[in-house]
């Protein structure tokens, strides 16, 4: 991590459990990010925390560190059963739950606390087998958690820590009833440590904190601008007819090491994937229609660098931490202003720089004024020469439900294409 992303506060300065500090330092984490430096003094004192911080600033490690410390420092209830986890971490998406689990594994290995994972889509029996052996920390999405609870595979009566991650996204996805169902089955707020983290702390999120937490302390890390000063933003105004050719020309010019392209619909994403795959790019597709095993495989391949480009709907815009994303392309300007911030927040993370390129086409240009008002600044406009756009493009591939979601490997040097300034 860049030093500009960290504070002078060290994890070892806190009265954290020694095993937690050792695990953090083994992973190279010595200094706290701002949200960690604000939250840890409160959680270590047993205070509930509702935290807001910009995407990529260390929210996950803030609540994981607090959770592991609390469980190591407080005994479980005397009559705890094997199907009773001690901590519950709720996430809005399968991908985020899997990611939190991966981030927690080094801490689990160092401390001996057992992790469980519960998410819908697949793996029901495999997940259940782990739960039946007994877990200390259960991470999951609300639907699968409720499913296991209703069938008495898990009992939430011994919960000592509750974490709600990406709370605003929970509302957006309509999970608030599920959250309240789960909260009704854990011990009262005063008998547990509660943490809520979100990129935004809207009125409805604060209302949820008031309902379900014990006099939570609000901590906020607000950047000077919502989009982060390390992200270079750029905007083009293509016609609908030139939009795809402009995207492909920009990709050839930028030749990004690792890029995410966002579009507003799954059908648009499939179309983009088809054009890029036909042109020889190593590209993966991530939409709600992609099967769960394939989604995880595509994310893993993208994270490892086996794929250079990921085309995604906003299902991937929240919570995913994929290191070293150099470019984000907004093929469509999002209808929701917050989604613009979350999309481009995939790059410029953990002190790195990033580049966001947005295409304001005839269909979605009307979204731009609200986005610029929300982020508090105008997005710099760049021009292009229509005559310089790529025009020797192969016929796009068409996705069938049986074919893989990946394109061929990209090989060779980029075409010698340049846009005019």
From Swiss-Prot:
UniProt key word RNA-binding: yes
Disulfide bonds: none
Helicase ATP-binding domain location: 40-219
Catalytic activity: ATP + H2O = ADP + phosphate + H(+)
Ranges of residues in domain Helicase C-terminal: 245-390
Gene3D superfamilies: P-loop containing nucleotide triphosphate hydrolases
GO molecular function: ATP binding; ATP hydrolysis activity; RNA binding; RNA helicase activity
Main localisation: cytoplasm
EC number(s) from the headed UniProt entry: 3.6.4.13
Record localization: Cytoplasm
Keywords: ATP-binding, Cytoplasm, Helicase, Hydrolase, Nucleotide-binding, RNA-binding
Domain of life: Bacteria
Any single GO CC term annotated in Swiss-Prot or TrEMBL for this entry: cytosol
Enzyme class (EC, first level): hydrolase
Pfam families attached to this UniProt entry: DEAD, Helicase_C
Binding sites annotated in the UniProt record for ATP: 53-60
SMART domains: DEXDc, HELICc
A GO BP entry: RNA catabolic process
Sequence segments annotated as region (Disordered): 396-421
Keyword Transferase listed: no
Motif (DEAD box): 165-168
Low complexity: bias regions: 402-414
Assembly and oligomerization: Component of the RNA degradosome, which is a multiprotein complex involved in RNA processing and mRNA degradation.
Described function: DEAD-box RNA helicase involved in RNA degradation. Has RNA-dependent ATPase activity and unwinds double-stranded RNA.
Protein name as catalogued: ATP-dependent RNA helicase RhlB
């Amino acid at each position: 991590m860049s030093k500009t992303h960290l504070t002078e506060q060290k994890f070892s300065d806190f009265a954290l459990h020694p095993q937690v500090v050792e695990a953090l330092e083994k992973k190279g984490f010595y200094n706290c990010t701002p949200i960690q430096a604000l939250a840890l003094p409160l959680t270590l004192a047993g205070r509930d925390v509702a935290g807001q911080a910009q995407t990529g600033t260390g929210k996950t490690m803030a609540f994981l560190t607090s959770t592991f410390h609390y469980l190591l420092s407080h005994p479980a209830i005397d009559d705890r059963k094997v199907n009773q986890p001690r901590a519950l971490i709720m996430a809005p998406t399968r991908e985020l739950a899997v990611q939190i689990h991966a981030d927690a594994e080094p801490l689990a290995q160092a401390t001996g606390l057992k992790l469980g994972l519960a998410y819908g889509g697949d793996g029901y029996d495999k997940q259940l087998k782990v739960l039946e052996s007994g877990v200390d920390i259960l991470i999951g999405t609300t639907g699968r958690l409720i499913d296991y609870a209703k069938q008495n595979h898990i009992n939430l009566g011994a919960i000592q820590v509750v974490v709600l991650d990406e709370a605003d996204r929970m509302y957006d996805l309509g999970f608030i009833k599920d959250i309240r169902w789960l909260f009704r089955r854990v011990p009262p707020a005063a008998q547990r440590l509660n943490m809520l983290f979100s990129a935004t702390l809207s009125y409805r999120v604060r209302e949820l904190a008031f309902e379900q937490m014990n006099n939570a302390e609000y901590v906020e890390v607000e950047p000077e601008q919502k989009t982060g000063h390390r992200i270079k933003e750029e905007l083009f105004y293509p016609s609908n007819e030139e939009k795809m050719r402009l995207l492909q020309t920009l990709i050839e010019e930028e030749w990004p090491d690792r890029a995410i392209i966002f579009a507003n619909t799954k059908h648009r994403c499939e179309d983009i994937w088809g054009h890029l795959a036909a042109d020889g790019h190593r590209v993966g597709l991530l939409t709600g229609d992609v099967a769960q095993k394939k989604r995880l495989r595509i994310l893993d391949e993208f994270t490892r660098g086996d794929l250079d480009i990921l085309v995604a709907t906003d299902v991937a815009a929240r919570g995913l931490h994929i290191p070293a994303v150099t470019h984000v392309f907004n093929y469509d300007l999002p209808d929701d202003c917050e989604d613009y911030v979350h999309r481009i927040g995939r790059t410029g993370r953990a002190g790195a720089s990033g580049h966001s390129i947005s295409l304001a086409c005839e269909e979605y240009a009307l979204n731009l004024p609200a986005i610029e008002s929300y982020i508090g600044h105008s997005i710099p406009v760049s021009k292009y020469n229509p005559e310089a756009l790529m025009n020797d493009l192969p016929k796009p591939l068409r996705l069938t439900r049986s074919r893989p979601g990946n394109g061929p490997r990209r090989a060779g040097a980029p075409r010698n294409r340049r846009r005019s300034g």
